Amino acid sequence: MRIGSLGKRFGILLALFVLSSRGHGQVLIALLFGEKLNSGKLEFGLTGGLNLANISNIPDAKSRAGLNLGLFFNIKLNDNLYIHPEAIPKYPTGVSKVKPYSLNNPGLDSLLSSGDVTRKIKNITVPILVRYRLKGQLFAEAGPQIGLRTKAKDFFESGDLTYENDIEDHITRFDFGFALGLAQRLRKEPGAMALGIRYYFGVTDIDKFDEGSQKNNVWQINLSIPVGAGKQKQKAPAN
């Protein structure tokens, strides 16, 4: 399969995946296209797991946990080297337990001053990784990652009171950085699931106004599930 043809298919699938806002719609797309896309040198499937996100230079902030969901291609160059692009429409970042800041409303400021703030940022991300076999079915991976911010809100909580503040004007539309990690295939056979751990460190200052450089940092634990690869193996003619 040529890289140009693969790029077109990846772009079409990414657009469909993003437009399907609910998780079950994304799973359905993967099931519909998986069998047609998988081959001896190409795996396609779903990836999902846990994000543990933080933002640098926000005093006393704690990490924020959230679930990610996307699709992946695993393109075999040789037995040890792979190109591994992903499209992840559900990629949460942000922080929790931030000290309240002024909303320029004395009444609200007084009510919310004893609580804390959770910053929730929704993104679409596309990492383009190189995977190299270290030993057996254990792979190292590294590469660039670009993110598109879709929503950004701060949630103030003080006792039973909750207040939502839209901060999209404060957060950059795009984020760029690098990801590195390890991936362990659970079996040698085609179509095997893989369990991975990854760290993303952003190089973009995502806050347009606050002093200091605020950059995304995310730990990920993911499970990758090829779709249709097992059927392709069954259909392959015997040598």
Regions found by a protein language model. Give the residues of each.
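Short glycine/proline- and aromatic-enriched beta-strand/turn motifs that initiate or cap beta-hairpins
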Residues: 24-76
